[in-house]
Amino acid sequence: ELLTDNMARPYSSLDYTAVWNRETNFFTPTTGGLYTDFYYAIYRANVVVESFDLVEGLDDATRLRLEAESRFVRAVCHWYLVKMWAYPYGYTADNSHLGVPLRTDAVAPPSPRATVAEVYAQILEDLEFAKANLPNENGPYASSMAASGFLAHIHFLRQDWSASRAEAERVINSGLFQLDDDLDRYEAGSDSVLAGDLINPETVFGITGGHQTPIRVFDPDKIVVVADHTVPAPS
């Protein structure tokens, strides 16, 4: 996301400048903590899935929705991990090349890296579960449409064109989203575009909140900020 147009402006951080310029290294904080942060999120998702019996008065519908939301998070995190720390899908004919460790239990002994085929199989299983058991609209939380959006992208990378098209058309034909009227998301002459401005009618699933203030990322022509790490400045 740091290298795409999902950004706003401005303020300062050499950390994000390094990402924008593709000059990251082991000591770049933003990338250095990603591996651990994704597994923290996966761990918490697994804890939720394994802890329902500890909650009194939890009805079946709520339990199913929470499990689906948790498995959505687990799938998305595993997907970003395998994209960043493994050769891409299709690098070997059967995708037997090493991916990343799979974590589907809250407490598990250290395990070797699963193959890319195994990681993608788990991702698809979790997203299909989320798609089947989440509502099409779910407020700020994961939804069935969000699961279809990720499935469309993942099937595209797998070169399963028909499956990718089916998931994309499901989202498009839902009537819940529409293309943004203005492709210029950065107001000319504006000093700041807040993260909230980047959630628009075409957003299927987005995260804009965070504890950080807006951060500058430089290119030769403009100053921008990553939306996922911006919060409105105090008045």
Where are these regions (language model features)?
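Short coil/turn linking the two alpha-helices of tandem helical-hairpin repeats
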Residues: V82-Y89, N138, L157-D160
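Hydrophobic-face positions in mid-chain alpha helices that act as interaction patches
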Residues: R165-S235
